[in-house]
């Protein structure tokens, strides 16, 4: 295990370089990201196994996420709390080479298109997703998940929990798009998750009125994270405030979102596209889920309970569907539990390089850890 401490800053996002096996970027904020500066750290693992800072950029607001430019080895994009995205060249000092500003609230996520490598997207508290080109300051397209009421398709008995005071923040954040991602298989597909507990799947080739499917993913509680499986184009995972990880088959989504939820037992809801579930995967909300780049049935999660976990998706054995669920397994499919962080874990990423299983994680404790989750 390797460690790097970002003195005075809390980690929000981390990503390995797609070009260099020893380089990482970390997005961070001072004062837990609540107020004050942000900082982009460019780190390298040297030959002696130490993590060293090779460059950094101080920003005027917290950084919530980042993405390496898939077509330029020295460029990193960051999502900033003032509603802007900033593109930095790691060979320069101090200033970004481009600023993109259209969002009206904090930008919570950014993601580079892995297929065409020419576009990137952003998602924001303002309820929108924007698609950009690094060659122009204006966005190419704005996507807005349909405004869906939290209880629209939830049975009133099951929605009682929403009336508890501890969940009053959900109504305030219902339009916040916490994360959005391009599909690694199709440059035209975008997946997002929002505070209204819905995930949205967009096909940007279609007209705006017909380009999305919305499906309830976390029982009326905020959906905080989502990811496409790297090998199974039709499989996605989500995580949220209900402490659960759910795995979905997007081929089973109905075109009309009102039909995606079907009653099977009075007072209960069933979504036909949910193919697996890890209930109570963590003790607190799940902030990040990400599929392995080396295995089709392994994923990682990071949580407010200060841990990262590696899971095996028991519904697939790596070659075919097994029709099993993690919820019926004694270990829930858990492979490894990383417990070295002492604060909320926000960011985690798999290494593309070397022996499969190496990951990096960062948290509010200001630490970046590099560790092996597969032994």
Curated annotation (Swiss-Prot):
Segments annotated as WD repeats: 58-89, 102-133, 172-203, 218-249, 281-312, 340-372
Give the matching PROSITE patterns.
WD_REPEATS_1, WD_REPEATS_2, WD_REPEATS_REGION
A GO MF annotation of the entry reads:
peroxisome matrix targeting signal-2 binding
Q: Which UniProt keywords apply?
A: Cytoplasm, Peroxisome, Protein transport, Repeat, Transport, WD repeat
UniProt subcellular location: Cytoplasm, Cytosol; Peroxisome matrix
Primary residence: cytoplasm
Any further remarks?
Answer: Present with 589 molecules/cell in log phase SD medium.
The protein's assembly and partners: Interacts with PEX21.
Q: Identify the PANTHER family for this entry.
A: PEROXISOMAL TARGETING SIGNAL 2 RECEPTOR
Write down what this protein is called.
Peroxisomal targeting signal 2 receptor
Q: Please give the organism.
A: Saccharomyces cerevisiae (strain ATCC 204508 / S288c) (Baker's yeast)
Question: Source organism lineage?
Answer: Eukaryota, Fungi, Dikarya, Ascomycota, Saccharomycotina
């Amino acid at each position: 295990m390797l460690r790097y401490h970002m003195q005075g800053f809390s980690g929000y996002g981390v990503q390995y370089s797609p070009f260099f096996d020893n380089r990482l970027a970390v997005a961070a904020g001072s004062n837990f990201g609540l107020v004050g500066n942000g900082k982009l750290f460019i780190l390298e693992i040297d030959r002696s196994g130490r993590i060293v800072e090779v460059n950094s950029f101080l920003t005027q607001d917290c950084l919530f996420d980042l993405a390496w430019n898939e077509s330029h080895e020295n460029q990193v994009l960051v999502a900033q709390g003032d509603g802007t995205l900033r593109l930095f060249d790691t060979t320069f000092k101090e200033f970004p080479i481009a600023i993109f500003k259209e969002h009206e609230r904090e930008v919570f996520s950014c993601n580079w298109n892995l297929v065409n490598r020419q576009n990137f997207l952003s998602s924001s508290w303002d309820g929108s997703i924007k698609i950009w080109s690094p060659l122009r300051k204006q966005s190419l397209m704005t996507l807005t998940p349909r405004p869906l009421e939290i209880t629209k398709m939830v049975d009133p008995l099951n929605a009682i929990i929403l009336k508890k005071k501890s969940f009053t923040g959900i109504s305030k954040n219902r339009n916040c798009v916490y994360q959005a991602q391009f599909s690694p298989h199709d440059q035209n597909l975008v997946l997002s998750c929002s505070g209204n507990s819905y995930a949205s799947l967009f096909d940007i080739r279609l007209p705006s009125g017909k380009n999305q499917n919305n499906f309830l993913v976390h029982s009326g509680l905020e959906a905080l994270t989502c990811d496409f499986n790297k090998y199974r184009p039709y499989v996605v995972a989500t995580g949220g405030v209900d402490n659960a990880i759910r795995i979905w088959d997007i081929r089973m989504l109905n075109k009309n979102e009102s039909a995606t939820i079907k009653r099977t037992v009075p007072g209960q809801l069933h979504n036909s596209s949910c193919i697996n579930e890890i209930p109570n995967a963590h003790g607190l909300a799940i902030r990040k889920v990400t599929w392995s780049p080396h295995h089709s049935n392994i994923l990682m999660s990071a949580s407010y309970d200060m841990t990262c976990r590696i899971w095996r998706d028991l519904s697939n054995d790596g070659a075919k569907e097994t029709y099993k669920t993690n919820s019926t397994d004694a270990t829930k499919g858990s492979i490894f539990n990383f417990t070295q962080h002492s604060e909320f874990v926000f960011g985690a990423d798999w290494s593309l390089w070397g022996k499969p299983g190496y990951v990096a994680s960062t948290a509010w404790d200001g630490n970046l850890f590099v560790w092996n989750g597969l032994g």
